[in-house]
Amino acid sequence: MAYFPFYIDIENKNILVVGGGTVALRKIEKLSPFKPSITVVSPKICEEILKFNVKAVEREFDDNDLNGVFCVISATDNEQVNSHIFELCKEKNILVNTVDDKEKCGFIFPALVQKNSVTVGITTSGKSPIYAKYLKEQFLNMLENTNSDTAETLWQYREYIKKNTADEELRKKVFSALMSMCLCGESIDVDVVNKIIKENS
């Protein structure tokens, strides 16, 4: 099965994590930087999870826990509970990730690389996590060795360039030249942008 890489705004979205151990912790660590509203349901929740901004509910899973949730992470060590949650989510059209059970996943977690405004998600569709990890390290190394302000600078002058260029072909040339300067660590201001526009017109 191939997975389409949607990038979704999950800020303040209600995400339910069922399970309170290290597996659940790893998922919460990945989700937290994107500021969702996370509820953790488990009879026992590890201390590391409680350090995150989560709502902790220390009891067994209840079917009503699914009310109003955007997606579910099923991370218990009980296969019967995981299967029950998966079937309920399928009935209610709720996205569910059953940890370590690809057949019971409506979505999967990619290996994530984050650097300033750049987010890269890498997946082998669940076939080889170790290869995904290797690729993650390669991308991270590449980003570490480029100007970290490139995306922000291009965004800063995006509207200005669109307003001051006559056509799409010219815009592409200007953005390409600007990006090359950013990657070389050169200082950018309006005068520099105007010069690039003039040189490519």
Give short role names for the model-derived ranges.
Residues G126-S201:
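An accessory alpha-helical subdomain
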Residues I38, A56, L95-V96:
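Hydrophobic beta-strand scaffold residues
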Residues N14, F70-C71:
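Structural motif
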Residues G21-V23, Q80, G126:
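Residue-level detector of alpha-helix initiation sites
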Residues M1-K44, I49-K51:
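Hydrophobic, well-ordered beta-alpha structural blocks that scaffold small-molecule cofactor pockets
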Residues K51-N67:
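Glycine-rich, highly charged phosphate/nucleotide-binding loops
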Residues C71-A75, N82-I108:
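ADP-ribose/adenylate-binding Rossmann-like module
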Residues T98-N147:
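E1/E1-like adenylate-forming module used to activate ubiquitin-like modifiers
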